[in-house]
From Swiss-Prot:
Enzyme Commission (EC) number: 3.5.4.19
Protein name: Phosphoribosyl-AMP cyclohydrolase
Cofactor note text: Binds 1 Mg(2+) ion per subunit. Binds 1 zinc ion per subunit.
Name of the top EC class for this enzyme: hydrolase
Coiled coil spans: none
Pfam families: PRA-CH
Organism name: Rhizobium johnstonii (strain DSM 114642 / LMG 32736 / 3841)
Swiss-Prot/TrEMBL cofactor(s): Mg(2+); Zn(2+)
Length: 150
């Protein structure tokens, strides 16, 4: 499979906003933000980043790939845990500088490395004048120790 090549974005704003060529606007590190939701119920699952290779692989294979900023490498989401993300729809915003993936999650139906369905399992509240985190989704779909050995 040959890698997709993305053309440079147009300087013409209307070309970015209309139908036609998909010309993603990667940041100065070569990344684009990816928002990921469940294709069935719309729950926000995660926010990640993609480089051109990850975006191309995602489009070509229908399986979500990302670029790990902390590890500095490409990663196929769910490759270790079995919680692969099958992409049902990809959208971009008006500036083509963010991607929205609607996915179905295989395996344990978990997206977060903590074993939860979503990476957004905590709320931020103000307690005694201090911002604090409260867990609102404590249901583990898998044990990270068993899957990752951590």
């Amino acid at each position: 499979m040959s890698q997709l090549i993305f053309n440079q974005p147009s300087e013409d704003k209307s070309a970015l906003e209309d139908a036609g060529d998909f010309t993603p606007r990667f940041d100065d590190r070569g990344l684009i933000t990816a928002i990921v939701t469940d294709a069935g119920d719309g729950e926000l699952l995660m926010v990640a980043h993609m480089n051109a290779q990850a975006l191309a692989l995602t489009i070509q294979t229908g399986t979500a790939h990302y670029f790990s900023r902390s590890r500095g490498k490409l990663w196929k989401k769910g490759e270790t845990s079995g919680n692969l993300q099958t992409v049902k729809e990809i959208r971009t915003d008006c500036d083509q500088d963010a991607i929205w993936l609607k996915v179905e999650v295989a395996g344990h139906d978990a997206t977060c490395h903590t074993g939860r369905r979503s990476c957004f399992y905590r709320t931020i509240t103000l307690q005694d004048g201090k911002p604090m985190l409260d867990i609102v989704d404590d249901e583990l779909h898998f044990d990270p120790q068993d899957v990752y050995g951590k």
